[in-house]
Amino acid sequence: MILPTIAIIGRPNVGKSTLVNRLCQSNDAIVFDKPGVTRDRTYQNASWGGKEFQIVDTGGLVFDDDSEFLPEIRAQVFLALEEASLALLVVDGNQGVTDGDLSIAKWLRNSSCKTIIAVNKCESTTLGISLASEFWKLGLGEPYPVSAIHGSGTGDLLDLVIGELPENNIQEEEEKIMMSIIGRPNVGKSSLLNSISGEKRAIVSDISGTTTDSIDTLIKKGDTQWKIVDTAGIRRKKNVKYGTEFFGINRAFKSIDRSDVCVLVIDAIDGVTDQDQKLAGRIEEQGRACIIVINKWDLVEKNSSTIYQVEKELRSKLYFLHWSKMIFISALTGQRVDNIFEHALKAVNQHRRRVATSVVNEVLKESISWKSPPTKRSGKQGRLYYGTQVKNKPPTFTLFVNDPKLFGITYRRYIEKQIRLNLGFEGTPLILLWRGKQQRALNKEVERGNIELVQKD
């Protein structure tokens, strides 16, 4: 279903993101008492009165200042209005009409998009009507008093909004694969998003921390619909101050946790840092599918063997993700960027894959024939009876043995390696659960025909 879009527009610090959270009944938009917190355009779904729609939050719009990120923010607002079915101009009732409001109103009057004025910070219902009346002079119709913090007036505002929206274009809902672009600040995540999407979807700058929130972008490649999230750069905790970066990093970690696949971006010049290793550990810990993208490869002086030497060095430091595909790209030139989708889709498919118990046990049987389970000094030897896949996302196998303590880390790694060699699973972590089981209980299952033992006592 293609949803109509509402663009939230206004000066910096008038409460746009707070209003977005109120209308969407969420706290996904970062709210902080400082101008310029929102820079890129961010999307959230909402519903009211049985009608679904999409709200796009935009950065504070300023026409008479070109400092820092303001021109880029302006470009993002212009793009948001182009795709919107309705514009919601948010103004500050306590400040009254400002020159900035007048400039934005003039621009909106020249656009073809229907506009509704939401006069925010009207906590008093009675006083709010008086405060809102001043905004008639913007020439965009009746202003509506609301309080984004307390919620007063927002229900009436939503009633008005859904009355102005076109009917939803109902199509068969396509499954979306969620891909999160993860990495330290300034490794080229936003440049990669722009290269992937073919538009300037995110603001790019040499200044670390340009992206302060997680940005969602929908892209269709072949028959696959992707939801791509560019996340805020993640730094060491001691370097992160409470504020926009703190909230953005929390969003980034949440993006990892709910992703189908993570794209871990590494700077080819800097190599793998301690923070990159921690991010790799987080991805593995959460059981996410992953591919590793080495960006800025165009800046590396190389010969025919460089790529092999560099990959070996990088993998030695990213041992958490030994199962991940590694791709060397340039987000700036577009070199090998399209390969990301191919390998990400393979990783997702492996992450969701299920294998029949009979196939698992064939692999285990062969593995044991090549290398028997270890024997302790006491003379007691490990017995691997059988295994079965109990879940996917990530693929999880339970291996039933006589005593899990008899199987050390070396043999456990050997079994995982054999499963990967025989069954694949590139791009996804595997979880092997070693469970002790009594021979008597096993015999009953064998008698019922439920299982066939790989190894007997």
From Swiss-Prot:
Top-level taxonomic group: Bacteria
Biological-process GO terms, alphabetical: ribosome biogenesis
GO molecular function: GTP binding; ribosome binding
Domain EngA-type G, residue spans: 4-169, 177-352
Annotated GTP 1 binding sites: 10-17, 57-61, 120-123
PROSITE patterns, per database record: G_ENGA (PS51712)
Chain positions recorded as GTP 2 binding sites: 183-190, 230-234, 295-298
Ranges of residues in domain KH-like: 353-438
Keyword Repeat (UniProt): yes
Keyword Nucleotide-binding: yes
A Pfam family annotated for this UniProt entry: MMR_HSR1
Keywords carried by this UniProt record: GTP-binding, Nucleotide-binding, Repeat, Ribosome biogenesis
Annotated family: Belongs to the TRAFAC class TrmE-Era-EngA-EngB-Septin-like GTPase superfamily. EngA (Der) GTPase family.
Function: GTPase that plays an essential role in the late steps of ribosome biogenesis.
Subunit relationships: Associates with the 50S ribosomal subunit.
Record-given protein name: GTPase Der
Gene that this sequence comes from: der
